[in-house]
Amino acid sequence: MPTRSLPTFLTLLLLASIDWVSKLVVLLKSCQLSPHSSAFLYSYVWGHFSFLIIPSFNEGAAFGLFAQYKIPLLIFRVCVILGLALFLRIKYKSLHRRTRIALTLILAGALGNVGDILLHGKVVDFLFLSYYSWRFPSFNLADAFISIGTLLLIGHLYFNKESKKCF
């Protein structure tokens, strides 16, 4: 592995590890709850905004889609991870720094969720946001990494005047 890509690789492992540890902590804490306590581990309410930590499981892709296709979905996810990792490895030197950061975030999130599927057979979600009656589907840090990485990549592609510098 070239030394230039080592920080990216270490960041990828660090982010995936943070995701796995956060899920482990939530699962361990939820096992300590008594059957008579509330289902959430933490709550913060500010006006009409609320943030809760509630463990839940997702057997499908985003929003539980394709839950009935577990094996094809896992194969697809692994292929996407391998494809992105290969692309990042081959094109590393020519990629714009923002593109490398975005792809690293996306890969870290994908690794975090695939690790869950391999370990538990489903993804552990635990972050829940709501505002008034609007409720966002529960998610985890891996999902946040994927979303932030995707937004960074789209923003960079959109605002980069020289598109050649992105890829």
UniProtKB/Swiss-Prot annotation:
Keywords recorded for this protein, A-Z: Aspartyl protease, Cell inner membrane, Cell membrane, Hydrolase, Membrane, Protease, Transmembrane, Transmembrane helix
What EC class is this?
hydrolase
Q: Catalytic residues? A: D125, D143
At the top level of its lineage, which domain of life is listed? Bacteria
Pathway the protein acts in: Protein modification; lipoprotein biosynthesis (signal peptide cleavage)
Question: What does the similarity note say?
Answer: Belongs to the peptidase A8 family.
Q: What does this protein do?
A: This protein specifically catalyzes the removal of signal peptides from prolipoproteins.
The chemistry this enzyme catalyses reads: Release of signal peptides from bacterial membrane prolipoproteins. Hydrolyzes -Xaa-Yaa-Zaa-|-(S,diacylglyceryl)Cys-, in which Xaa is hydrophobic (preferably Leu), and Yaa (Ala or Ser) and Zaa (Gly or Ala) have small, neutral side chains
Record-listed E.C. numbers: 3.4.23.36
Q: Which residues cross the membrane?
A: 8-28, 46-66, 68-88, 101-121, 139-159
Q: How does it sit in the membrane?
A: Multi-pass membrane protein
Subcellular localization is given as: Cell inner membrane
Matching Pfam families: Peptidase_A8
Give the signal peptide range.
Answer: none
Source organism per UniProt: Chlamydia trachomatis serovar L2b (strain UCH-1/proctitis)
Cellular component, GO, one term: plasma membrane
GO molecular function terms here?
aspartic-type endopeptidase activity
Protein name, UniProt field: Lipoprotein signal peptidase
The alphabetized list of GO BP terms reads:
proteolysis
What InterPro entries does its record include?
Peptidase_A8
